[in-house]
Amino acid sequence: MAKIHELSENLTNQIAAGEVIERPASVVKELVENSLDAGATRIRVDFIDAGLKQIVVQDNGTGIARDQVDLAFTRHATSKISNEHDLFKVSTLGFRGEALASISAVSHVEIVTATENAIGIKADFSGGSKKGQEDAASQKGTKITVRDLFFNTPARLKYLRSPRTEIMKIVDIINRLSLGYPHVSFTLSNTGKVLFRTTGNGNLKQTVANVYGRHIAEKMESFEAKDSDFKITGLMSKPELTRSTRNFISILLNGRYIKNFQLNNAIMDGYGSKLAARHYPIVVITIHVDPMLVDVNVHPTKQEVRLSKEKELSRLITDAISDALLDKTEQSSGFANLENKRETLVDQLEFNLNQDVVNTTRKTPEVHEEAEKPEFLVKQEAKNSEEPKNETEHNYVDINIPREDDQYIITKTWDKNVALQQKLMPFSNKKVDQEVISTGDETLANNLPRLAYVGKIDTYLLAENDGDLYLIDQVAARRRLQFEQIYQTITSKKIVQQGLLTPIVLEFGNLDFLQIKDKIYQIKQLGIYLDEFGQNSFIVRSYPTWIHDHVEESIREILDNYLNLDKGKTQNLFKRVAALEAKRSVKGKINLSAAEGTQIITDLRKTSDPYHDADGRLILVRISQNELRKMFKKGE
């Protein structure tokens, strides 16, 4: 066994830095939290090369006295606690006195600081040692510049991720802190280009607009509650506005962003069954509590805390969100009758296929969902089964029905002056069948026998084969057909674009904007072309024809889900997007004719999996002749 010896101060500083400073975002977090503890109302963060080359944090806080600068860079030196009793009632973001010492141990640090009506001071530190000091002109506040992070511990660099990912982690830190301090003005810049700015006017909804985008903030509602120990306030998204991960839930405890599984579950419980499976809300919740009830000294990053009365707090959060949703539901219940009348109108519609036919040519079969607006197109059955298989010309019948909303997307055919709303029945004629079947697995498809259409009950089709009865969920079946068509279109790399008469401008939060930029090539493979258009915005001038008529809403949801997909093969990503659009475009029962029901059954047999939709839900159930006989006790 080697001889035990005491480690050098330089080495111990580097070890300590490893616990606190994991990446550039850790530096930003520690320095900005110091600024907030100093009472700053304006904080500016600039970085270069994802923070590895340089990070600058400047504030208008109280500053550091001249004779305390050296002490500030000493390990376990702090102004925030004085004795062991203070450790159990921490009211500041920092308290260990490790941040500046840890940062200076693995970088070159320059600090310029001044207190009220005092001469400023400039000091330099490198590798944990002081290199120089001089007077400097400075306003009240502190400016810290960190250069060449990990210059003396190069092994740490190999554990960092891509520059884009490191930038997004910095952005996420500032986002969370700005949500906790809406009265503080934050500015974040990358190589001189402003990525993010808040006004600091104290309006949380305005800060949410800065972080997530105005379109998100407009769909969020406030909530609040309190008891003898806790006071909670915040903003919550409506149930229809969700994300595919929990990353958009921000819990701020006395201004500190924390991660807490129990409180996350309390938020989800507040929404109850109003959220779709694997969908999560956007929530910003601020919790005010006596510091005596919180132990923040349980994790190096201080993002995990130990809470007294956690169960009581969880119940308070759940009830507050549930009550807020109940209030909104009662206010909107008056719209239910209008929706029922609209559905009745659609159900009573008799499809007249003898009207004049409007011809248009598309390479991609389009999508139909149950008419949310009662004006749509119905595809006419092909009259000539001997038409060439490589043709993709579709015939449509235009049925005009009074509509509630005159706002819809105009489809522009460049060689004809024809305006059509893009909604049609998702049933392939025989020409398109050849495209669908080419993507399927013949072995699997042939396992489904040829079924004869019998009739329908509500949303279910009835079919039979050799005395066996089959119940087919028409919604799931249509989604499977739609998925096959969309997936084949995307993977064919021959995606037809439809021009927009009026381009769509999509505004995103700063983090989403960076993520989209990072995946712009993969998004183009979907046929979605985005061009930067101002700060945190993209412009869309055309869209792929496999998207149905709610173009902006559809693209937003596709991008949101696409961003949150786990990394994997591009084909798997294509399947997820195709499944999403199939689910969006087919949302309810429609009044099917016998011919249309027969066509669904015929097409279903040609798909890659006729038994499940793209989300794995069951499409059909078989009841054998023997089972039917047993039900009626035949043969006994």
UniProtKB/Swiss-Prot annotation:
This is DNA mismatch repair protein MutL. SMART domains: DNA_mis_repair, MutL_C. It comes from the Bacteria. Coiled coil: none annotated. Pfam families: DNA_mis_repair, HATPase_c_3, MutL_C. GO terms for biological process: mismatch repair. This protein is involved in the repair of mismatches in DNA. It is required for dam-dependent methyl-directed DNA mismatch repair. May act as a 'molecular matchmaker', a protein that promotes the formation of a stable complex between two or more DNA-binding proteins in an ATP-dependent manner without itself being part of a final effector complex. SUPFAM superfamilies: ATPase domain of HSP90 chaperone/DNA topoisomerase II/histidine kinase, DNA mismatch repair protein MutL, Ribosomal protein S5 domain 2-like. Residues 363-393 have a biased composition (Basic and acidic residues). Keywords: DNA damage, DNA repair. Residues 362-393 are annotated as: Disordered. It comes from Lactobacillus helveticus (strain DPC 4571). GO terms for cellular component: mismatch repair complex. The keyword DNA repair applies. Belongs to the DNA mismatch repair MutL/HexB family. One of its GO terms (molecular function) is ATP-dependent DNA damage sensor activity.
